[in-house]
């Protein structure tokens, strides 16, 4: 034990152990509470109502990506440069918040008519569709600021207040869902409870953010210019990804039926265990990677280690899913109990996508942006091929499509991260030689 304490890596390992246990335990609570809320919704909503709920949440995700447009990436990249200066970090945060409000208007104008069409196309009445659209607005409003307000805390590794806020929001949502869904099992109420809980959480999150970033600062033109450059490079690809990322739901909503929409939504709830991994990753790993100096060998070593360990964890999760698929499906209820093969396929696609997302998050945190025409081309090609290979009107066919698209995207983004790090090394060597 004494020898271990004198080991040069001892303090680092202990500190990481404390951080991971703290973050992991809090996220287990957050995800467990969220999982219970989700299961209540799955079990108590009718198949058709849950199909509407899935469509609305899918569109909410697309709206969130559109309203961000790469702004949060820009704020993280710029904030990583000035994270020790409260005033400068405040300027970065305020600039990002102001930019996002403007993007939100365009997002609403584009997304809500599409959602209205999909709801009506899948059997919703005008009243139901209208109520669902109205219920999305509070949830969307909350997403405009929460991801940005978290950045000062993440950069300063102030984990405890962030975790407390997430737990409080999850418990608040569960309380509201449990108190309404037994009496009023409607999709729009389930969506509304999530939005109200998040708005309450953001009020408190802003107080925590103020400790590290002065939110009374005004928008900074130079910071806006730097963030805008990232947005300009990111936006075309993000516009495409906000729809291609949920391509399975979009295709089924057009060519399939409400039952298939509900099935893919219910199976997606199981992937919350992987969401736990990504939340811990975004809180602990990405900000630290963003703060690293431009030392190619160090970046290369950490980039490789991170992706390797994530892959091992995902392989373990996928194996458990295969072995215990009957028990997992029992949790979802009788409407979804025969989807064993589909569950494994979905978790396979989700695992591959998670590796891709990890690589993407890491290199974006450095301010590296891939040309959008490359990412779009690399995604469109497997989608087109899949339409000829698989029956995309069925759930299983859509899941095969997901796996093929995710695999191509994973290879692309992991490779791009390595390319940028190796290019950085080459540039440094050239500058030293000159």
Per-region residue spans from a language model:
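N-terminal membrane topogenesis motif
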Residues: 1-33, 87, 94, 205, ...
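Membrane-interface junctions at transmembrane-helix termini in multi-pass inner-membrane proteins
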Residues: 140-164, 348-375
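Hydrophobic alpha-helical transmembrane segments
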Residues: 128-134, 138, 163-211, 268, ...
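Transmembrane helix-bundle signature of multi-pass secondary active exporters and lipid flippases
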Residues: 57-65, 241, 264-283, 313-317, ...
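Membrane-water interface segments that mark the loop-to-transmembrane alpha-helix transition
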Residues: 15-30, 56, 65, 69-116, ...
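Signature of the first transmembrane helix
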Residues: 13-73, 233-259, 406
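Helix-loop junctions and terminal segments of transmembrane helices
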Residues: 68-84, 154-155, 213-214, 271-296, ...
